[in-house]
Amino acid sequence: MDELLSRIRKCEVCKDYLPLGPRPVVQLSSFSKIMIISQAPGRRVHETGIPWNDISGKRLREWMNVDDVLFYNPLIFSIAPMGFCYPGKGKSGDLPPRPQCAPLWHPQIFKHFMGKPLILLIGQYAQKYYLRSNCGNSLTETVRNYKQYLPDYFPLPHPSLRNQNWVKINPWFMEKVIPELQKRIKELINHNP
């Protein structure tokens, strides 16, 4: 995995489309128990080079009930978004992830895993890409029906502040989905084959 990680970090496939230039932000290990696939790094993450090093990351860690030490341990969590670099700002938030990364790099990453990690699909870009025709008609439908995607995938909304209202109007998410997520994460962290 080290050689692959080195190639990913040198990737410049999308450089002409990236306003701040390429800086792929990933965290990988062949032994990871959980794989996080989301959209693309935000500006702050681009600046620090640390995945989920922002308010959304803090909230995601709260949802999973893990601290920074566990979250940034690649033996537990691999992180490879749909787009590895910050795509720039759009009219209502960041632009969509560049379409080149996932098809180019994800299959190579998955080949290097020693086991089969639980894949957290965070947001619609990741869910539509991986669940394809099995994806619900909306993020709400997909997340509500999370059990049908287990044990391979666990779909979640993006934990950004933009989605605070979504969490409020869908109380079942915090009442039912989050406890199940925390249970599965804890089981995987504590399982030593």
Give the predicted meaning of each segment.
Residues M1-E187:
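A polyanion-binding, active-site-adjacent surface
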Residues N190-P193:
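Short, basic, low-complexity termini and linkers enriched in Ser/Thr/Gly/Pro
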